[in-house]
Amino acid sequence: MAKVSGRSKKTIVDDEISDKTASASESASIALTSKRKRKSPPRNAPLQRSSPYRGVTRHRWTGRYEAHLWDKNSWNDTQTKKGRQVYLGAYDEEEAAARAYDLAALKYWGRDTLLNFPLPSYDEDVKEMEGQSKEEYIGSLRRKSSGFSRGVSKYRGVARHHHNGRWEARIGRVFATQEEAAIAYDIAAIEYRGLNAVTNFDVSRYLNPNAAADKADSDSKPIRSPSREPESSDDNKSPKSEEVIEPSTSPEVIPTRRSFPDDIQTYFGCQDSGKLATEEDVIFDCFNSYINPGFYNEFDYGP
């Protein structure tokens, strides 16, 4: 047998080592490739919608269907960019949320916009929305939604409080800015709680300046007493025709209360009757005195 030289043995060993190194590097590259494999869809891929209807999404926690509309012609609340999302309410049924979007889209963009359902099914609604502004109509849609009322009541503007289980009354409207809503709340708070109400702005800005000025002018004018006739009948004497009396102290000015507009937004919550009454307590105390105590028991033990 031919003897294998030492040089040949060394060549064979080197070939085996190179083969093992190549296989190891190949397996490492395969593992690295599988590790870097993208599991999420690419960014340019369309997002998966939670509802097939236009303008409808399902809330991941509550399970309700929310309707939204994108108003590209309006500015957002911070006035940093054009366009804002308009909330149309939360609904238990997906179809109801889709119809709410259709009605809002018809109010914003007219009959040529894309809808979820055929246009003829909204003929009566289109006639109803003609006499209302966008804000008023959107507010009416929200009030009809399932998320508007937290409790079950047959009365308009009445809902069960989610903390103490009692009933609360609401009346409101939609404002364009936070300042307008704050002023509306201040006016309602002063009307129902008096000048000691906690307001967002100073109370003096809500007093009628014209009435206060007229009252101040009337107080500053001297009070004239009727002329006294002289005791003697002598015509040559010039009797004192009038006497000027200056008031020592001006009477206290009672500020007038402003009338409460019907469309002002405010919130009136029913507090727990077991607590001591303070200046911020329930504004309907005068109304409670006329109610039979059994009226509240009927609701407290209800479903």
From Swiss-Prot:
Cellular component GO terms, alphabetical: nucleus
Sequence ranges of Polar residues compositional bias: 20-32
Any matching Pfam family: AP2
GO biological process assignments: ethylene-activated signaling pathway
Basic and acidic residues: compositionally biased ranges: 214-243
Basic residues composition bias: residue spans: 1-10
Record-linked InterPro entries: AP2/ERF_dom, AP2/ERF_dom_sf, DNA-bd_dom_sf
Record localization: Nucleus
An example molecular function term from Gene Ontology annotations: DNA-binding transcription factor activity
Renumbered residue ranges of the record's region Disordered: 1-55, 212-259
DNA-binding region: 52-118, 154-202
Keyword terms: Activator, DNA-binding, Ethylene signaling pathway, Nucleus, Repeat, Transcription, Transcription regulation
Function (record text): Probably acts as a transcriptional activator. Binds to the GCC-box pathogenesis-related promoter element. May be involved in the regulation of gene expression by stress factors and by components of stress signal transduction pathways.
Alphabetized PANTHER family for the sequence: AP2-LIKE ETHYLENE-RESPONSIVE TRANSCRIPTION FACTOR (PTHR32467), AP2_ERF DOMAIN-CONTAINING PROTEIN (PTHR32467:SF243)
Similarity comment text for this entry: Belongs to the AP2/ERF transcription factor family. AP2 subfamily.
Protein name, UniProt field: AP2-like ethylene-responsive transcription factor At1g79700
Species whose genome carries this gene: Arabidopsis thaliana (Mouse-ear cress)
